[in-house]
Regions:
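A composition-driven surface/loop motif
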Residues: 1-561
Length: 561
């Protein structure tokens, strides 16, 4: 898209190293600065090693066309405070650079600075390259709104600290965003605690985001919503970082900071490829993931909600949500966890799916969080063993505050700690659940401090004898169960075959185990269980079959799905 000089409605701002020329009324030049004083349409072009545009009026459209503009004393573009309906539109390749020193007292330390209470929308039809050598690239102050409208172009952002920030509100609609943040966050809306007027919200309607940053990729103080989009994110040195210190830094993929009522993260759809030194997804309040594809490698938790975590829509097809935590300390964690549907994979060095309380790193907590394991990678990460506890849990401290409810989905857990672990209760209403842990009695495939109730669904637990009493939670008349107690060494394949010899369940045993439990509506005493070693030799395991003895279905009084 190019704009012709024949348009009399456009005021042209032409930069060169010898000065700035203005083609009409509405803008005033003073030294290396041109100030837009009246509403209207303007086009900036040219090249200058020291220049600056100040938008001083509402209802301004500022086109950028083949503009190369740098400044060592202020931001190349400044939008003054309390302005509405300001549009900045890149229609041809534009490069903006800020070379200010961070110690400057008169500058803006940004490439584009939007001041308090202004509303600015951005459109990009070409390549928009922005370098922030001082601090930030695009920065909105208190109560600002920055809206990135539908665009076909690419934002190529390199920031010393933050790539895109607004204390008030950020919204993204289409476009490609390539962001490198050397010493800060990539995208954030995180006003100071003393600023109670700014919203601290981020909405992503769409877009393609390629992000590398030292700290968090997306941070919102109160609310972060993704409707859809494509995200390729790496924080710090990735999930296997040996330099990340969680006690002094935060390097999460997506984060909601506050834990006040109403604060939440919602991921409605999208494609995500996350490689984070810290948690991949972290909300200090609630977190909902409904649809999309998620590939997660996390140095700490894969998915964490300090309060309520919901995965999948109830009764939805499982292929609508594909959530794969392929490496983590704890796979999926929340005070309450509700799994409705989807394909859920949790791979963890500690617990796979864990209902526990409080925050895991952004706010202090009262209790110890044990660190008994000795993984080489994990020990190299600072602050893991004997670290401070997970923080305060809301409401009562009893078991009733914590629960896991599974209504459906295909759930796969591979872990060194407990597979499905609740500080309170576990309710299984449906789904196909496979848990592979290890033979250490302190780490069980299913562990709970409150009650365990299996109303419906298939459950396969492979690991230790600590879950020997799990059958007591199966509701009478619903399920049959079978178990095997005996040592089985690692590197074998477990297969369960029905009366017709068809394989109905299988999985890889990658750790030494001593107990297997299986329950299903379809199970009968004609089923057979086998393990196959690396040579292909198949051996039958002699399982014990049983019927549940518990009474009528109990009401799931703790489930608020």
């Amino acid at each position: 898209m190019a704009i012709s000089r024949d348009s009399n409605a456009i005021v042209y701002l032409t930069f060169s190293n010898s000065g700035i020329s203005v083609s009409g009324d509405g803008a005033k030049v003073s030294g290396t600065t041109v100030t837009i004083e009246k509403s209207g349409t303007y086009l900036a072009q040219g090249l200058s090693d020291e220049g600056n545009i100040v938008v001083g009026s509402s209802s301004v459209v500022l086109y950028l066309q083949h503009l190369v503009l740098s400044s060592k004393i202020t931001a190349p573009i400044v939008v003054n405070s309390k302005l509405d309906d300001v549009k900045i539109i890149n229609i041809q390749n534009t490069t903006l650079k800020d070379y200010e020193a961070e110690t400057t007292t008169s500058g803006e330390c940004a490439v584009i600075k939007v001041k308090k209470k202004s509303v600015v929308s951005f459109e990009n039809q070409g390549l928009f390259t922005l370098y922030g050598e001082c601090k930030n690239v695009i920065k909105g102050g208190a109560e600002t709104s920055l809206i990135f409208a539908n665009s076909n172009g690419e934002y190529k952002i390199t920031a010393e600290k933050t790539g895109i920030a607004s204390d008030g509100y950020l919204e993204f609609n289409l476009g490609k965003y390539t962001i490198i943040s050397k010493n800060g966050d990539a995208i954030k809306s995180n006003p100071e605690d003393t600023d109670t007027a700014s919203l601290g919200k981020i909405l992503v309607n769409s877009g393609t985001f390629n992000i590398e940053c030292l700290n968090d990729a997306f941070t919102a103080k109160t609310n972060l919503t993704v409707v859809k989009g494509t995200f390729d994110i790496k924080t710090e040195n990735g999930y296997d970082s040996t330099t990340f210190d969680k006690d002094t830094s935060s390097a999460k993929g997506f984060k909601v900071k506050n834990n006040d009522t109403g604060c939440e993260m919602k991921l409605l759809d999208g494609e995500y490829n996350l490689n984070t030194a810290d948690d991949a997804f972290h909300s200090n309040r609630d977190l909902t993931i409904l649809k999309g594809k998620y590939i997660i490698y996390a140095g700490d938790d894969g998915v964490h909600a300090s309060f309520n975590l919901v995965l999948g829509e109830k009764d939805a097809p499982n292929d609508e949500l594909d959530l794969q935590v392929l490496s983590s300390y704890e796979g999926i964690e929340g005070m309450t966890i509700t799994i409705n549907s989807g394909r859920i994979v949790a791979t963890a060095e500690d617990d796979g799916i864990n209902a526990a309380g409080g925050d895991s790193g952004d706010q202090p907590g009262p209790g110890p969080r044990p660190g008994p394991w000795n993984k080489t990678r994990s020990n190299l990460r600072k602050g893991r063993l004997g670290e401070p506890g997970p923080g305060p849990s809301p409401g009562g401290r009893g078991n009733a505050s914590y629960y896991i409810s599974i209504y459906g989905g295909e759930v796969y857990v591979f872990c060194d700690g407990d597979g499905i672990d609740s500080n309170g209760n576990i309710f299984i209403h449906g789904g196909d659940i496979k848990v592979f842990s290890q033979g250490n009695r302190d780490n069980e495939p299913v562990d709970h401090d409150g009650n365990f109730t299996l109303f419906n669904g298939d459950l396969l637990g492979v690991g230790s004898r600590g879950m020997e009493q799990i059958h007591l939670g199966i509701k009478k008349g619903n399920e049959m169960y079978a178990y095997y107690s005996g040592a089985i060494t690692k590197d074998k394949t477990l297969r369960i075959k029905n009366e017709n010899g068809e394989v109905v369940k299988e999985g890889e045993i990658t750790k030494d185990i001593n107990y297997i439990f299986f329950s299903s509506l379809k199970l009968n005493n004609s089923y057979k269980f086998y393990v196959t070693d690396s040579t292909g030799t198949e051996s039958e395991l002699k399982f014990t079959f049983g019927q549940p003895e518990s009474g009528d279905d109990d009401e799931d009084v703790h489930d608020n799905n």
